[in-house]
Each structure stands twice: as structure tokens, then as C-alpha cells.
Design a protein with these regions (language model features):
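Flanking helices and flexible, charged tails adjoining ferredoxin-like Fe-S electron-transfer domains
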Residues: 340-393, 408, 454-456, 460-489, ...
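Short, amphipathic alpha-helical interaction segments positioned at domain boundaries
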Residues: 124-163
């Protein structure tokens, strides 16, 4: 995709097109095509609905049947008419076989999937039907699990027969689908009974019609794509609901089990929770369906009919979604779950040229339509989150892309737990981040162009502190799409923010997860590398406790590579590994005297400090080398640990220091001296102990290309006498024996090589994230990486699923803040709220003295938000499934019955009666437009 190319990932991301054939299927096809069986050719020709095609051994109608259908079975089927019920005796007479042999063959053909049953007659006697291929026998063949594994070409057969017959006809199909395939039926809650709606638009109508006659079976589309290697992370399971006679057929042929209404309703609810589209069969008119499917756009052949060909009439319901902009807060939940990419994030604020005008998808109604109009990469393109003009800068800037506007609005309404749940869809550790986040969202905040940015992090901190009390903790559900647990065990190595984030989201998906941590307590660098006056241990413990309550196992004091190897963990049943051990080692200066007593790596110093001890941990004059946030933490900790005076020295000038501005100010308030633009030259020693350090003037930190390449004036030096030198000039990954015996490869700086989209290493079952991949960054970066790893691992442990196909790449471009027209009377003019420090007798306590907003301050600060972003729905892309309405917490998106004719359901045999008039009108429109 274009966004990948812009990130330089074009060589990594392999685009997959809609007509891929599975490798195993190709091999089977070749064998089947080598022999020409006339009866199979005749049968394929009889059933196919491809107009004008003469079936040969090279066609799917042949090789899709040849591997599973015997010539004798073909003789029976050739004596039947497509979709015409026949009794056993009638079939036996037509094929000129005994009733006993015919019954035996029909039973075998039913198990294969070539024949279905029917009891819709006066005395409810059993009849047999030769169904069409799709929907029909191609699906039934794939629903036979053992068969599709032995004959993978059946999966390719299903794929092609759901596509090839439609390639020319789809632009001419009117609303309602003309009796072809499937039809979207909205989420029931999205269309409450009103005078406008009709009965067939409600799932409840169909469930009542087939009361007490339900069966549940595996999704043929998900299985087909998995067999073909084109799974998109939507795992097959009991998601398809057969009704009426189809329920009996599924059970009698071993394709499913009977279900009561409670099980059916639970399946429908889980489908909506997971973003699956409800569809009903649409080949029998308005009085009959035989299945309710719960479809994922990445794998569903029925949804593909509208998405590949860009012809929404093939799928859409009578409804379309629309947004009330004043209520929308651009949280992105509707966008995330929209199957067609109709809902995208845009902006609410006007530009200097007026409101943004968003493009609408081209439709085939008035233009010629051919392959050049198709979207062969619809599975990827439907995952694009934003219009090119961008959305709220806060969401864009946050590495985890938190729904900032959303949780601010919920907080303003006093809905604090709802706000917490919304935050945790992207960040399981908001209290931790509330204390230590680098606040990229605030740096980007549009309000900052007027006066001061909204205090986003303080609002989040207030929300997160609601669950620091054990009774208030939000424990998410930990079940998969079937309401069960997956069997695949996942091992996380490293209990830092990346590892615990991956564990959280994997557990939310229903995976059994264990975290291996070499330290005695989980937390990683946020526990061992951040002083408690910035992040108190009880804050970490409260959020870690949520993971424990979710059932995540913590195996602390276990160093993988030393105490147990990855191979031994494989033998224990772990199917994938996520390495997130952080950059826990320090970097050396590379100067004389660095090995002297009194020289300590900053990160090692932070690990050793125990704030509960009253005795000093360090004595004398202390110099901290470095200018980043960790260096500031080291300096402030040294002061609390007993240093008589602390001096920071760094290469950068004051304006260029990597440390956050507020952290620099806090250091200065504590009388820590900061010397800028100096680089270490030599550590002075006496008797093996530090006595001082010599610096040289730094004239430039980076070269003309922006690369780190410090330049010095060797004639301008400075000597500082000291007893300790704490080195904080970067961090390194300490691998130990962790990756010995694996194929994992490292970069020269000891970070790991991995795919930039999936984080998969050269060892397929090992994924990485956080500082081991990026080098030292912030906690929020690691948290975001952990969630991405969850998606990759989820796909990896299920054979046949692509790690990239149909994947949401989480691209959220920012709107142009320089092109906004913000009227002075359009926003609240209140100043930014400020937190005050807690009073303490000892100003150098290890306690965090920063306070949290009051509830009143939260409401005042929330009112300062400009509400930059909003969802925009393209009506030409919307298929009226209603999933968006189930995700919105703000009553901002609704369905309206804009296309009532889309509820017209026809029998398959009558499709041309609908297509021909519509086709004629379309041709007239095209000609009129051309002449005009």
C-alpha cells in the first residue's frame, strides 16, 4: 500500500491479490486435470452458472468435483435438476439404479456436499436437491473438514465459483442483490422496530420463523481462506447458523450440531462484539432463508462480491450509516469495526477555505465498469483509518493512537469507568503512563496553537487512578470469538511494558499466556529504571494485578536462556514467543578511567536504589553524564540517595536537551547544576577511585546529515572534581544466553532484526518488541508495540493466516493545524488547569509529590478540548450492517433506511427479471452521461 511505501516498507509487505491459488491446491489440480472424465465435465456444465462457458478439465467446475465425486455419483446427479427437490424413488428412476444403491450414493454425496436435503412438502417427506455451486455445494464441500484437508483444491474451487460467475454481472445488479448469494441484515439494535422497517430486515423475524430449528457449523469462508493461506486472523469456528431444513442437513451430514435459541443469540452477540457482519442467504425469495452467517470481510466470499468489484448492491441492506458531527469525538471505534472502510476519521474543524469536502466512492450506476474499477486489494484498503486530510493531532501523535477525544468527553460526563475501558482498548497501563508519559499528544494538541495544550495526560491520570483501588478494577473478558479459550500457549519473555501489553491483549483474545521475568517482580524498566518519585510501585502493582486477575501467569526469577531455554519451552507446548526484555544495560563512554571505582552506569544505579532504606546509598560529589530523561532521573535519585551535590553535563545545549522540559525544570528546582555543550574526555582517578572528570567543549552534536557525530574544541576543557560519575548516555540490550540456538539475528547495536510490520524475527515463532527492537524509547512506544505483536502472534499460531493481509496498519495522519479557521467564540476560554504538589516535610522524598486533578478540574480542562476530529461515512461504501452503532459510546452514528428497495429478496431463478430492467436503465444513464 502507498502508506507502506512511504514508510520504506515496500519490500517487506507482499501484496496478495484476490485470485491466489493455494500451493497444495495447484498440485491437486494438476493431477486431476491430467485425466478427462466426461461425466464430471457434464456435471460441471450442468451446475455452473457461468454464462457461455464450455467446461474443460482446466475449469474449476471440473477439478473442483473430480477429486471427490465418482463417475457413479455423477450419473446420479446428472439425472437431477439444479435446485429441484426429488424423492429417492424419482432419483433412482432417473439414474436407472436400484433404490437401495441410489440411497447409498445420495447419502455419500450428501456427506461430500454435492447433495442437500429438503422436507418442504405437505407430508414432510425427505427429498434431495442438487444445489448450485454458490451458495451451495462448494460451501458444503468445504464444511466437510476432513475432506478439505485431503482435497485442498476444494477450497480453491469455492473461491473461484464465488467469483468467476459474477465478474461481468455485478455492475448490473440492482439493490437487493437480485437473488444472488447473500444479503446483509443489520444488527437488530441498530434498527429498532419502526413503521419504516419491514420484518425481513430483522434477525428476530427469521429466528422466530424457524423457531427451535437451528444448527451451528464451521464457517466455510474462514476455512477456505485458511486452507488457501489467505487467512486474515479471523479464525474458523462454529459461527454459521443453519435454520429449518438446513439445520437437519448440517447435523445429519456431520457438519454441525443442533443449537437452542440461547446458543444462537450468544453467537450473534459475540459476532457483533468481534465486528462480524450478519448476512442471510438470498436465493429463495422473501419467504425463505437457510442460513445466517457472521462474516469477516477479510475472508468472506459473499462480502467480496461487493468489495472486490466495488458494487455495494451485491451486499448492502436497506440502511446506511450517518454521523452526527456534534456528538462524534473521533474515538475511531466505528472506523476500526467498519468492514468496508466506509467510516473513516476526518476533521470537524473548518479549514481557511471552509469545511473539508470528503470524496465519495465511485459507483457503477452511470459509468462503464470493468476490471480497472475493481479493488483487488480491498482487504488492505478497507483497513485505512483516515482520509488523506487527516484527523485529530492528539490521536495521530500518540504512538498507541489512544482515543483522546473520546476519553476526555466521557470524563467530562463523569463516566470514568467507561473512559477507562476506552483507554484500555489501546493502552492497558494508563496509570503508569499518566505518571511518566512523554505526552506527544499534548505537543501536537491544536489548542496549543491558541494558548496552551489541553492537559490530556492529567485527565488520563485522573481516569486511571479510579482503578488503583482494588474494588474498582476493570477486568476485561478473556474469551475468543467462540466464547472459549484458544489452546495455543504463548510465552512472553520480559515483564516490561511491551511484554505485559502483548500479554494483556493476547489474553483478551482468549490465549493462555505466561510471562517469564528474570527479576523477582514484574515491571521491567518502569519498575527498575524509573525512580519512585516519578512512578510509585503501588501504581505499577495495581495495573499488574489486573493482568493476574485476567489469568496471566507470572514466572518471576526465571531467566530464559540460563534457567530454561526457548527450545525447552517449545517442548512444554508454547507455540510462540515474544521477546521484550528491554534495553536494561548501560552504555560506556569509551574514555580513560571508566573502570575506576565510583563510575556506575545510570540504569544500574537506579536498579540498586531502594527508597525504603533510610541510609544513604551514595556519598559525595556526583557528576551525571547525559542529558536525557534517564539522566535527569539518575541525577534526582542521586540527590535523594545521599549525594552532597549533583551536576549534570551533556553534549546538547539547553534547548536541544533530549530530556522533557518539565523534568529539566524539576532538576533545576532541586538545585541540580546542568552544564550544557560539554563532552567527557577523561575520568581522573587516584588509587583506582574517581577524583574528577575532564570535559571538552562540544561545538556540534550532529553533522549536516543529522547523524550523531559530535565535534569538539579540544582547547576548551572543563574539570569537575567529584567522587562519583554516573553514566547515562544510552542503554543497551543484554541478551545473555536467551537467543542461543535460535536463528534470531542482531544488528550491530545489538537490537534485533525483525519485520517492521509484524515484528517477526528470522525464527518464525519468535517475535520481538519494545527497546530490544527500536532501542531505548518511551513506555507508550513499547505498549503500542506489544499490541501489534499480539496481532502477529494471533495470526501466526493459526496455520494458514497471513501476518499482513488485511491488517490494520494503524496509520493516523494529522490534520493541517496551519490551515484551520478557529473562531474566538467557538471554544472555552478557560486557562489550562494545573496540578499542585503534595506537601511533604522532606522535599527530596522518594514519594511522588505530584497531585492529580480534582473532579472539577477534569471537567474544566475537558471543556478546553476543541474536538478536532470526527468520523465521516461514505454512503457509497456503506453496506448498512450497523456494527458501527454497537461501538459508539456517544450516540453519534445511526442507520437510516435510505434504500428501501435493497430489501427486495428474489429467488435465484428470477434474477434476470431484476437484472435486465436495471441493466437497461443503467445503459441509458451511461449513454446519456456520455452524450452530455
Amino acid at each position: 500500500r502507498d502508506c507502506l511505501l512511504s514508510r520504506g516498507l515496500g519490500d517487506v509487505y507482499k501484496r496478495q491479490v484476490y485470485y491466489k491459488i493455494s500451493e497444495s491446491g495447484i498440485m491437486q489440480r494438476r493431477d486431476l486435470m491430467a485425466e478427462q472424465r466426461e461425466l464430471i465435465i457434464k456435471l460441471g456444465q450442468k451446475i455452473t452458472d457461468r454464462i457461455g462457458v464450455k467446461v474443460t478439465t482446466e475449469d474449476p467446475e471440473y477439478w473442483g468435483l473430480a477429486g471427490v465425486v465418482t463417475d457413479e455419483m455423477a450419473e446420479v446427479a446428472l439425472g437431477m435438476k439444479v435446485r429441484v427437490p426429488m424423492t429417492l424413488e424419482q432419483v433412482a428412476k432417473k439414474c436407472k439404479k436400484s433404490v437401495e444403491r441410489t440411497e447409498q450414493l445420495l447419502q455419500e454425496m450428501s456427506v461430500i456436499g454435492l447433495i442437500e436435503y429438503n422436507w418442504e412438502n405437505e407430508d414432510r417427506h425427505k427429498q434431495y436437491i442438487l444445489p448450485m455451486f454458490v451458495p451451495g455445494s462448494a460451501e458444503f464441500m468445504v464444511m466437510n473438514g476432513r475432506q478439505v484437508e485431503e482435497h485442498p483444491e476444494v477450497a480453491d474451487f469455492f473461491e473461484q465459483m464465488s467469483r468467476l460467475p459474477l465478474e461481468k454481472v455485478t455492475p448490473m445488479v440492482p439493490p437487493g442483490g437480485a437473488g444472488i448469494g447473500m444479503h446483509v441484515i443489520p444488527v437488530e439494535t441498530a434498527i429498532p422496530a419502526t413503521p419504516e422497517s419491514v420484518s425481513i430486515e430483522h434477525i428476530s423475524y427469521w429466528l422466530n420463523k424457524y423457531k427451535d430449528k437451528y444448527a451451528v457449523g464451521a464457517c466455510s469462508c474462514r476455512r477456505q481462506q485458511r486452507v488457501r493461506g489467505e487467512g486474515t486472523g479471523d479464525i474458523e469456528g462454529d459461527l454459521c447458523i443453519g435454520v429449518g431444513d438446513m439445520a437437519d442437513y448440517l447435523v445429519e451430514t456431520g457438519r454441525g450440531h443442533y443449537a437452542d435459541i440461547d446458543e444462537v443469540m450468544a453467537i450473534l452477540k459475540r459476532a457483533e462484539d468481534n465486528g462480524y457482519v450478519h448476512q442471510i442467504t438470498n436465493i429463495d425469495g422473501e419467504d425463505k432463508i437457510f442460513a445466517i452467517c457472521n462474516c469477516a470481510v477479510g475472508v468472506c466470499n459473499a462480502l467480496r462480491t461487493s468489495q472486490l468489484f466495488n458494487t455495494p448492491n451485491m451486499s448492502r441492506s436497506a440502511y446506511r450509516a450517518s454521523v452526527t458531527p456534534d456528538r462524534c469525538v473521533a474515538c475511531g471505534r466505528c472506523v476500526q469495526y467498519c468492514p468496508t472502510g466506509a467510516a473513516k476519521l476526518g476533521q470537524k474543524l473548518c479549514t481557511k477555505n471552509g469545511p473539508v469536502e470528503y470524496p465519495q466512492h465511485e459507483l457503477p450506476d452511470t459509468v462503464k465498469w470493468g476490471p480497472e474499477k475493481w479493488d483487488k486489494n480491498y482487504r488492505d484498503n478497507n483497513q485505512i483509518n483516515c482520509y488523506d486530510t487527516g484527523t485529530a493531532p492528539c490521536k495521530s501523535a500518540c504512538p498507541a493512537h489512544l482515543p483522546v477525544q473520546g476519553y476526555i468527553k466521557l470524563a467530562s460526563q463523569g463516566r470514568y469507568m467507561d473512559a477507562l475501558k476506552l483507554i484500555k482498548t489501546e493502552n492497558p497501563f494508563p496509570a503508569v503512563c499518566g505518571a511518566i508519559c512523554n505526552r506527544k499528544c499534548e505537543d501536537a494538541c491544536t489548542r496549543g496553537t491558541i494558548d496552551q495544550a489541553v492537559a490530556i495526560d492529567e485527565i488520563k491520570k485522573f481516569i486511571a487512578e479510579q482503578e488503583l483501588h482494588e474494588s474498582n478494577r476493570y477486568i476485561p473478558e478473556t474469551v475468543n470469538h467462540e466464547g472459549k479459550q484458544f489452546e495455543q500457549k504463548i510465552a512472553i519473555i520480559g515483564a516490561g511494558p511491551a511484554g505485559m501489553s502483548a500479554a494483556y491483549y493476547l489474553r483478551c483474545k482468549g490465549y493462555p499466556v505466561d510471562i517469564f521475568e528474570k527479576e523477582k517482580t514484574p515491571g521491567g524498566m518502569i519498575l527498575n529504571g524509573i525512580p519512585s518519585f516519578r512512578l510509585e510501585e503501588q501504581v505499577i502493582e495495581a495495573e499488574v494485578d489486573v493482568l493476574r486477575k485476567m489469568g496471566i501467569g507470572f514466572k518471576c526469577g526465571v531467566e530464559v536462556g540460563r534457567d530454561i531455554t526457548i527450545e525447552q519451552l517449545r517442548q512444554q507446548g508454547y507455540k510462540a514467543f515474544y521477546i521484550a526484555i528491554g534495553a536494561q544495560g548501560g552504555r560506556k563512554l569509551g574514555i580513560a578511567g571508566e573502570d575506576a571505582d565510583g563510575v556506575i552506569a545510570g540504569v544500574e544505579f537506579l536498579k540498586k536504589i531502594n527508597p525504603d532504606e533510610k541510609s544513604a546509598h551514595i556519598k559525595g560529589r556526583t557528576v551525571v553524564v547525559g542529558g536525557g530523561n534517564v539522566a535527569v532521573d539518575v541525577a534526582r535519585t542521586a540527590l535523594r540517595a545521599g549525594a552532597s551535590e549533583v551536576t549534570m553535563v551533556c553534549l546538547e545545549d539547553r534547548a536541544s536537551m533530549p530530556a522533557a522540559k518539565d523534568e529539566i525544570e524539576e532538576a533545576l528546582e532541586e538545585n541540580i547544576t546542568i552544564n550544557n555543550s560539554w563532552g567527557p574526555k577523561e575520568i581522573l582517578t587516584a588509587g583506582g577511585k574517581v577524583t574528577g572528570i575532564v570535559f571538552r567543549k562540544c561545538t556540534a552534536v550532529r553533522d549536516a546529515q543529522g547523524r550523531f557525530n559530535p565535534q569538539y574544541d579540544e582547547n576548551d576543557t572543563m574539570t569537575i572534581e567529584c567522587d562519583n560519575v554516573l553514566v547515562s548516555v544510552g542503554q543497551s540490550v543484554v541478551w545473555g544466553s536467551l537467543i542461543e540456538g535460535t536463528k534470531v539475528e542482531l544488528n550491530p547495536n545489538m537490537t534485533v532484526k525483525a519485520d517492521p510490520v509484524t515484528y517477526q524475527t528470522a525464527e518464525p515463532d519468535i517475535f520481538v518488541g519494545g527497546d530490544v527492537y527500536t532501542g531505548p524509547r518511551f513506555a507508550i512506544d513499547a505498549i503500542a508495540a506489544g499490541k501489534e505483536a499480539c496481532e502477529s502472534i494471533h495470526r501466526y499460531v493459526h496455520k494458514g493466516h497471513s501476518l499482513t493481509l488485511g491488517r490494520n496498519l494503524r496509520q493516523f495522519p494529522s490534520l493541517d493545524k496551519d490551515n484551520l479557521a478557529i473562531e474566538p467564540d467557538s471554544y472555552d476560554n478557560a486557562p489550562r488547569q494545573a496540578c499542585h504538589k503534595k506537601t511533604d516535610e522532606n522535599g527530596l522524598t522518594f514519594r511522588d509529590l505530584r497531585s492529580t486533578f480534582t473532579e472539577e478540574q477534569v471537567k474544566k480542562e475537558a471543556a478546553r478540548c476543541l474536538g478536532c476530529g470526527a468520523t465521516v461515512v461514505d454512503p457509497n461504501k456503506c453496506i448498512g450492517c450497523g456494527l458501527c452503532t454497537t461501538k459508539c459510546e456517544f450516540d453519534a452514528i445511526h442507520l437510516s433506511r435510505d434504500i428501501p428497495e435493497a430489501s427486495t429478496m428474489r429467488k435465484s431463478e428470477d434474477k434476470m427479471k431484476a437484472i435486465l430492467p436495471y441493466m437497461l436503465k443503467r445503459e441509458i444513464k451511461i449513454k446519456f452521461k456520455k452524450d452530455k
